[in-house]
Amino acid sequence: MSLLTEVETYVLSIVPSGPLKAEIAQRLEDVFAGKNTDLEALMEWLKTRPILSPLTKGILGFVFTLTVPSERGLQRRRFVQNALNGNGDPNNMDRAVKLYRKLKREITFHGAKEIALSYSAGALASCMGLIYNRMGAVTTEVAFGLVCATCEQIADSQHRSHRQMVATTNPLIRHENRMVLASTTAKAMEQMAGSSEQAAEAMEVASQARQMVQAMRAIGTHPSSSAGLKDDLLENLQAYQKRMGVQMQRFK
Protein backbone atom coordinates (compact mmCIF):
# COMPACT_ATOMS: atom_id res chain seq x y z
CA MET A 1 0.00 0.00 0.00
CA SER A 2 1.42 3.37 -0.94
CA LEU A 3 1.94 6.07 1.68
CA LEU A 4 -0.83 8.33 0.34
CA THR A 5 -3.28 5.41 0.09
CA GLU A 6 -2.58 4.64 3.73
CA VAL A 7 -3.09 8.29 4.74
CA GLU A 8 -6.37 8.46 2.79
CA THR A 9 -7.57 5.23 4.46
CA TYR A 10 -6.87 6.47 7.99
CA VAL A 11 -8.30 9.95 7.44
CA LEU A 12 -11.53 8.65 5.88
CA SER A 13 -11.99 6.19 8.76
CA ILE A 14 -12.89 9.10 11.08
CA VAL A 15 -15.32 10.81 8.67
CA PRO A 16 -18.98 9.86 9.22
CA SER A 17 -20.57 7.87 6.36
CA GLY A 18 -22.76 9.78 3.95
CA PRO A 19 -22.59 11.87 0.76
CA LEU A 20 -20.07 14.24 2.40
CA LYS A 21 -17.64 11.36 2.97
CA ALA A 22 -17.72 10.54 -0.75
CA GLU A 23 -17.06 14.21 -1.51
CA ILE A 24 -14.10 14.37 0.91
CA ALA A 25 -12.67 11.13 -0.53
CA GLN A 26 -12.78 12.70 -4.00
CA ARG A 27 -11.05 15.88 -2.74
CA LEU A 28 -8.30 13.80 -1.06
CA GLU A 29 -7.77 11.76 -4.24
CA ASP A 30 -7.49 14.96 -6.30
CA VAL A 31 -5.07 16.54 -3.81
CA PHE A 32 -2.85 13.43 -3.67
CA ALA A 33 -2.87 13.18 -7.47
CA GLY A 34 -1.77 16.83 -7.73
CA LYS A 35 -5.02 17.83 -9.50
CA ASN A 36 -6.18 20.33 -6.88
CA THR A 37 -3.60 23.03 -6.23
CA ASP A 38 -5.74 25.85 -4.84
CA LEU A 39 -5.18 25.52 -1.08
CA GLU A 40 -7.11 28.70 -0.27
CA ALA A 41 -10.29 27.48 -2.00
CA LEU A 42 -9.88 24.00 -0.54
CA MET A 43 -9.63 25.32 3.03
CA GLU A 44 -12.64 27.61 2.51
CA TRP A 45 -14.64 24.62 1.26
CA LEU A 46 -13.56 22.52 4.26
CA LYS A 47 -14.37 25.25 6.77
CA THR A 48 -18.01 25.44 5.66
CA ARG A 49 -18.73 21.69 5.60
CA PRO A 50 -21.53 20.65 7.96
CA ILE A 51 -21.53 17.55 10.24
CA LEU A 52 -17.73 17.26 10.59
CA SER A 53 -16.32 17.77 14.08
CA PRO A 54 -13.80 20.62 14.54
CA LEU A 55 -11.03 18.04 15.15
CA THR A 56 -11.82 16.17 11.91
CA LYS A 57 -11.76 19.49 10.03
CA GLY A 58 -8.45 20.32 11.73
CA ILE A 59 -6.90 17.01 10.68
CA LEU A 60 -8.15 17.37 7.09
CA GLY A 61 -6.89 20.97 6.97
CA PHE A 62 -3.48 19.78 8.22
CA VAL A 63 -3.35 17.07 5.52
CA PHE A 64 -4.35 19.51 2.76
CA THR A 65 -1.72 22.03 3.93
CA LEU A 66 0.98 19.33 3.96
CA THR A 67 0.11 18.14 0.47
CA VAL A 68 -0.90 21.15 -1.61
CA PRO A 69 2.03 23.34 -2.65
CA SER A 70 1.47 26.93 -1.49
CA GLU A 71 3.28 30.24 -1.20
CA ARG A 72 5.36 30.44 1.96
CA GLY A 73 3.52 33.46 3.35
CA LEU A 74 0.05 31.88 3.13
CA GLN A 75 -1.98 32.62 6.25
CA ARG A 76 -2.67 29.79 8.70
CA ARG A 77 -6.39 29.16 9.21
CA ARG A 78 -7.97 29.83 12.60
CA PHE A 79 -10.39 26.87 12.45
CA VAL A 80 -7.45 24.47 12.05
CA GLN A 81 -5.41 26.16 14.80
CA ASN A 82 -8.35 26.02 17.25
CA ALA A 83 -8.99 22.34 16.50
CA LEU A 84 -5.33 21.40 17.00
CA ASN A 85 -4.70 23.14 20.32
CA GLY A 86 -5.36 20.03 22.45
CA ASN A 87 -8.41 21.67 24.09
CA GLY A 88 -6.06 24.23 25.60
CA ASP A 89 -4.91 21.62 28.14
CA PRO A 90 -1.31 22.38 29.26
CA ASN A 91 -0.72 18.65 29.88
CA ASN A 92 -1.48 17.93 26.23
CA MET A 93 0.92 20.68 25.19
CA ASP A 94 3.72 19.32 27.44
CA ARG A 95 3.30 15.84 26.02
CA ALA A 96 3.09 17.24 22.47
CA VAL A 97 6.47 18.97 22.90
CA LYS A 98 8.05 15.71 24.16
CA LEU A 99 6.53 13.82 21.23
CA TYR A 100 7.73 16.47 18.77
CA ARG A 101 11.33 16.09 20.01
CA LYS A 102 11.14 12.33 19.37
CA LEU A 103 9.55 12.80 15.94
CA LYS A 104 12.27 15.27 14.93
CA ARG A 105 14.79 12.42 15.19
CA GLU A 106 12.58 10.11 13.11
CA ILE A 107 12.60 9.97 9.31
CA THR A 108 10.11 7.24 8.34
CA PHE A 109 6.33 7.20 8.22
CA HIS A 110 5.97 3.90 10.10
CA GLY A 111 8.58 4.85 12.70
CA ALA A 112 6.73 8.09 13.45
CA LYS A 113 3.38 6.29 13.62
CA GLU A 114 4.71 3.71 16.09
CA ILE A 115 6.11 6.43 18.39
CA ALA A 116 2.93 8.52 18.18
CA LEU A 117 0.55 5.64 18.97
CA SER A 118 1.67 5.61 22.61
CA TYR A 119 0.27 9.15 23.12
CA SER A 120 -3.32 10.30 23.67
CA ALA A 121 -5.38 11.86 20.86
CA GLY A 122 -5.20 15.25 22.66
CA ALA A 123 -1.39 15.21 22.74
CA LEU A 124 -1.25 14.08 19.11
CA ALA A 125 -3.58 16.90 18.00
CA SER A 126 -1.45 19.43 19.94
CA CYS A 127 1.68 18.10 18.23
CA MET A 128 0.01 18.55 14.83
CA GLY A 129 -0.83 22.09 15.95
CA LEU A 130 2.86 22.80 16.69
CA ILE A 131 3.82 21.69 13.19
CA TYR A 132 0.88 23.49 11.55
CA ASN A 133 1.76 26.77 13.29
CA ARG A 134 5.35 26.41 12.02
CA MET A 135 6.68 26.14 15.58
CA GLY A 136 8.30 22.89 14.57
CA ALA A 137 9.34 21.21 11.35
CA VAL A 138 9.39 17.49 10.53
CA THR A 139 9.50 15.65 7.20
CA THR A 140 6.18 15.20 5.37
CA GLU A 141 6.42 11.42 5.90
CA VAL A 142 6.76 11.87 9.66
CA ALA A 143 3.86 14.35 9.71
CA PHE A 144 1.70 11.80 7.87
CA GLY A 145 2.70 9.14 10.43
CA LEU A 146 1.44 11.50 13.15
CA VAL A 147 -1.84 12.05 11.24
CA CYS A 148 -2.46 8.30 10.86
CA ALA A 149 -1.71 7.61 14.54
CA THR A 150 -4.21 10.32 15.55
CA CYS A 151 -6.88 8.90 13.24
CA GLU A 152 -6.26 5.40 14.61
CA GLN A 153 -6.79 6.63 18.19
CA ILE A 154 -10.03 8.41 17.20
CA ALA A 155 -11.29 5.47 15.09
CA ASP A 156 -10.60 3.09 18.02
CA SER A 157 -12.80 5.09 20.38
CA GLN A 158 -15.51 5.47 17.69
CA HIS A 159 -15.43 1.71 17.13
CA ARG A 160 -15.78 0.99 20.86
CA SER A 161 -18.74 3.35 21.04
CA HIS A 162 -20.32 1.80 17.93
CA ARG A 163 -19.81 -1.72 19.31
CA GLN A 164 -21.52 -0.71 22.55
CA MET A 165 -24.50 0.59 20.59
CA VAL A 166 -24.72 -2.50 18.37
CA ALA A 167 -24.41 -4.80 21.39
CA THR A 168 -26.96 -2.90 23.48
CA THR A 169 -29.89 -4.97 24.69
CA ASN A 170 -32.16 -1.93 24.88
CA PRO A 171 -34.89 -2.76 22.31
CA LEU A 172 -35.78 0.92 21.71
CA ILE A 173 -32.21 1.84 20.74
CA ARG A 174 -31.91 -1.24 18.50
CA HIS A 175 -35.27 -0.45 16.86
CA GLU A 176 -34.28 3.16 16.14
CA ASN A 177 -30.86 2.08 14.87
CA ARG A 178 -32.46 -0.37 12.40
CA MET A 179 -34.82 2.33 11.14
CA VAL A 180 -31.96 4.83 10.72
CA LEU A 181 -29.93 2.23 8.78
CA ALA A 182 -32.93 1.37 6.59
CA SER A 183 -33.54 5.05 5.88
CA THR A 184 -29.90 5.76 4.93
CA THR A 185 -29.81 2.59 2.79
CA ALA A 186 -32.92 3.80 0.95
CA LYS A 187 -31.29 7.18 0.41
CA ALA A 188 -28.17 5.48 -1.01
CA MET A 189 -30.35 3.36 -3.32
CA GLU A 190 -32.03 6.48 -4.69
CA GLN A 191 -28.63 8.06 -5.39
CA MET A 192 -27.26 4.92 -7.06
CA ALA A 193 -30.35 4.31 -9.15
CA GLY A 194 -29.82 7.45 -11.21
CA SER A 195 -32.20 8.13 -14.07
CA SER A 196 -32.27 4.95 -16.21
CA GLU A 197 -35.61 3.25 -16.93
CA GLN A 198 -34.69 0.16 -14.91
CA ALA A 199 -34.00 2.46 -11.97
CA ALA A 200 -37.70 3.25 -11.48
CA GLU A 201 -38.26 0.00 -9.61
CA ALA A 202 -35.32 0.53 -7.25
CA MET A 203 -36.45 4.11 -6.66
CA GLU A 204 -39.96 2.92 -5.86
CA VAL A 205 -38.69 0.36 -3.33
CA ALA A 206 -36.45 2.98 -1.69
CA SER A 207 -39.25 5.54 -1.56
CA GLN A 208 -41.68 3.04 0.00
CA ALA A 209 -39.08 2.06 2.60
CA ARG A 210 -38.55 5.67 3.63
CA GLN A 211 -42.31 6.28 3.87
CA MET A 212 -42.62 3.13 5.97
CA VAL A 213 -39.93 4.30 8.39
CA GLN A 214 -41.62 7.71 8.67
CA ALA A 215 -44.96 6.02 9.40
CA MET A 216 -43.37 3.71 12.00
CA ARG A 217 -41.89 6.72 13.75
CA ALA A 218 -45.11 8.72 13.55
CA ILE A 219 -47.40 6.06 15.04
CA GLY A 220 -44.84 4.36 17.30
CA THR A 221 -44.44 0.65 16.56
CA HIS A 222 -43.26 -2.43 18.43
CA PRO A 223 -39.44 -2.53 18.65
CA SER A 224 -39.27 -5.85 16.78
CA SER A 225 -41.17 -4.48 13.74
CA SER A 226 -37.98 -3.05 12.20
CA ALA A 227 -36.12 -6.39 12.20
CA GLY A 228 -34.80 -7.27 8.74
CA LEU A 229 -35.83 -3.93 7.22
CA LYS A 230 -32.34 -2.98 6.01
CA ASP A 231 -31.57 -6.52 4.77
CA ASP A 232 -34.79 -6.58 2.71
CA LEU A 233 -33.75 -3.30 1.13
CA LEU A 234 -30.25 -4.56 0.35
CA GLU A 235 -31.67 -7.69 -1.29
CA ASN A 236 -33.79 -5.45 -3.52
CA LEU A 237 -30.74 -3.34 -4.34
CA GLN A 238 -28.68 -6.41 -5.26
CA ALA A 239 -31.50 -7.79 -7.43
CA TYR A 240 -31.62 -4.43 -9.24
CA GLN A 241 -27.83 -4.46 -9.70
CA LYS A 242 -27.93 -7.99 -11.13
CA ARG A 243 -30.42 -6.87 -13.77
CA MET A 244 -28.07 -3.96 -14.55
CA GLY A 245 -25.18 -6.43 -14.92
CA VAL A 246 -23.39 -5.24 -11.77
CA GLN A 247 -22.18 -7.89 -9.33
CA MET A 248 -21.56 -6.40 -5.89
CA GLN A 249 -22.31 -8.75 -3.02
CA ARG A 250 -20.44 -6.99 -0.25
CA PHE A 251 -23.05 -4.55 1.04
CA LYS A 252 -24.09 -6.49 4.15
Swiss-Prot record:
Bilayer topology reads: Peripheral membrane protein
Q: Where in the cell is it found?
A: Virion membrane; Host nucleus
Locus of motif Nuclear localization signal: 101-105
- The region called RNP-binding is annotated at 165-252
What does the annotation give as the result of altering V205I?
No effect on filamentous virion particles morphology
Entry's Gene Ontology BP terms:
viral budding from plasma membrane
What is one Pfam family matched by this protein?
Flu_M1
Q: Does the keyword RNA-binding apply?
A: yes
Question: Which cellular component, as a GO term, is one annotated location?
Answer: virion membrane
Question: What terms describe the molecular function in GO for this protein?
Answer: RNA binding; structural constituent of virion
Please describe the quaternary structure of this protein.
Answer: Homodimer and homomultimer. Interacts with NEP. Binds ribonucleocapsid by both interacting with genomic RNA and NP protein. May interact with HA and NA. Cannot bind NP without genomic RNA.
Quote the protein name from its UniProt record: Matrix protein 1
Name the gene for this chain.
M
